[in-house]
């Protein structure tokens, strides 16, 4: 036997893939602080990473060294809490969002988790403008979870921010499968494909696409 799991009779490949993702999501439990932050995100209509994506973010952050992390798209702080859980005790999370209410709720989530103000830097404004002010080759990990239309711009800036050995992580890299549908050609799909192309063609990066959440494209910089 080759060790490959056989499909059950009548079980199609897509349903098996969906079962694997569902199992991955069910394997991660969130504490009360994360649950409260997630509930606030739902209340205001802010997107939030799934628990499995959050666990992956924590893992990648820890593997990267986790001292300087940049996040594009704060939301209500769910992803920020996961990132902080993988960071060193003296690490600083820089997180950017254009919505003041999102930043307020994220600040609340961080405070409830006992994370001191010296460990987070919340910046309001357009990410395209804020990112240009951040230091070159300084960050261990850059997480992009914002409007897919702007992914190419964020990828260019995000790679610039990465130190050698750093990791860039792009959420919504599959758009629920639309990015892989040859017939899909709307503006979001075109932008997401362009972001993926930029990463794939950058010889400094080693990428992988992970089918969790809305698709995670991660790449480490040489």
UniProtKB/Swiss-Prot annotation:
Ligand binding (S-adenosyl-L-methionine): 49, 71, 73-74, 79, 97-98, 147
Keyword set, alphabetical order: Methyltransferase, S-adenosyl-L-methionine, Transferase
Enzyme Commission number(s): 2.1.1.-
Keyword S-adenosyl-L-methionine: yes
CDD domains noted in UniProt: AdoMet_MTases
Superkingdom, taxonomy of origin: Bacteria
InterPro entries from the UniProt entry: Cation-dep_OMT, SAM-dependent_MTases_sf, SAM_O-MeTrfase
GO MF: O-methyltransferase activity; S-adenosylmethionine-dependent methyltransferase activity
Keyword Transferase part of the UniProt annotation: yes
GO annotation, biological process: methylation
Binding site for substrate: 145
PANTHER family: O-METHYLTRANSFERASE RV1220C-RELATED (PTHR10509:SF85), O-METHYLTRANSFERASE-RELATED (PTHR10509)
Family: Belongs to the class I-like SAM-binding methyltransferase superfamily. Cation-dependent O-methyltransferase family.
Protein name per its UniProtKB record: Putative O-methyltransferase MAP_2558
Species name: Mycolicibacterium paratuberculosis (strain ATCC BAA-968 / K-10)
Lineage: Bacteria, Bacillati, Actinomycetota, Actinomycetes, Mycobacteriales
């Amino acid at each position: 036997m080759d060790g490959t799991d056989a499909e059950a009779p009548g079980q199609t490949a897509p349903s098996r893939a969906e079962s694997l993702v569902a199992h991955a999501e069910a394997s991660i439990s969130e504490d009360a602080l994360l649950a409260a932050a997630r509930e606030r995100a739902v209340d205001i209509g802010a997107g939030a990473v799934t628990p499995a994506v959050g666990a992956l973010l924590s893992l990648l952050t820890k593997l990267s060294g986790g001292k300087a992390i940049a996040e594009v798209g704060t939301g209500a702080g769910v992803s920020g809490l996961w990132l902080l859980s993988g960071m060193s005790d003296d690490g600083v999370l820089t997180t950017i969002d254009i919505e003041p209410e999102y930043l307020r709720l994220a600040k609340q989530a961080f405070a409830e988790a006992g994370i001191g103000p010296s460990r987070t830097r919340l910046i309001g404004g357009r990410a395209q403008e804020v990112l240009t002010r951040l230091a070159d080759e300084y960050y261990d990990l850059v997480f992009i979870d914002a409007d897919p239309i702007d992914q190419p711009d964020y990828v260019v800036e995000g790679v610039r921010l990465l130190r050698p050995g750093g990791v860039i992580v792009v959420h919504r890299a599959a758009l629920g499968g639309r990015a892989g549908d040859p017939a899909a050609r709307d503006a979001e799909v075109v932008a997401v494909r362009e972001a993926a192309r930029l990463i794939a063609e950058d010889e400094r990066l080693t990428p992988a696409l992970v089918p969790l959440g809305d698709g995670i494209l991660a790449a480490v910089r040489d």
